[in-house]
């Protein structure tokens, strides 16, 4: 599974959770750091990312407008540290991996 991390999450999380995914990329790596959500979503779609991990509800709205790919993993945690986001993602790894392999759902909301 190829997963993109949105700009509202620090790029420092990548090495902490990379083991969970086949490919994990931060928007910073792609040079998309100052792009708006629509451009990020549509570029992720064009490049066939399986999912976007974000803190931003706009991605769910874009998903409803444009469909998958990518699916959306929406971290509804509010502002918290990169360490805390890492803990939340790892704690929910089974749900995330099940979601990514499922055809039934397009958005996974995670709470911390």
Predicted regions and their residues:
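Glycine-rich loop at the start of a catalytic domain that most often binds anionic cofactors/ligands
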Residues: 64-69
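Residues at secondary-structure transition points
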Residues: 31-39, 57, 80-84
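C-terminal structural segments of small proteins and small subunits
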Residues: 70-112
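Small/polar loops that bind or transfer phosphate-bearing groups
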Residues: 5-6, 54-55, 77
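Absolute protein N-terminus
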Residues: 1-2, 112
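Acidic, metal-binding active-site segment of PIN/NYN-like and related structure-specific nucleases
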Residues: 44-63
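N-terminal first-folded block
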Residues: 2-50
């Amino acid at each position: 599974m190829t997963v993109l991390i949105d700009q509202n999450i620090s790029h420092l999380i990548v090495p902490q959770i990379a083991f969970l995914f086949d490919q994990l990329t931060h928007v910073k790596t792609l040079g998309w750091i100052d792009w708006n959500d629509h451009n990020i979503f549509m570029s992720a779609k064009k490049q066939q990312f399986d999912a976007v991990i974000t803190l931003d509800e706009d991605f769910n709205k874009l998903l409803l407008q444009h469909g998958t790919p990518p699916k959306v993993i929406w971290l509804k945690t509010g502002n918290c540290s990169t360490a805390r986001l890492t803990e939340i993602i790892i704690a929910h790894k089974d749900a995330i991996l099940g979601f990514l392999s499922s055809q039934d759902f397009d958005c996974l909301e995670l709470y911390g």
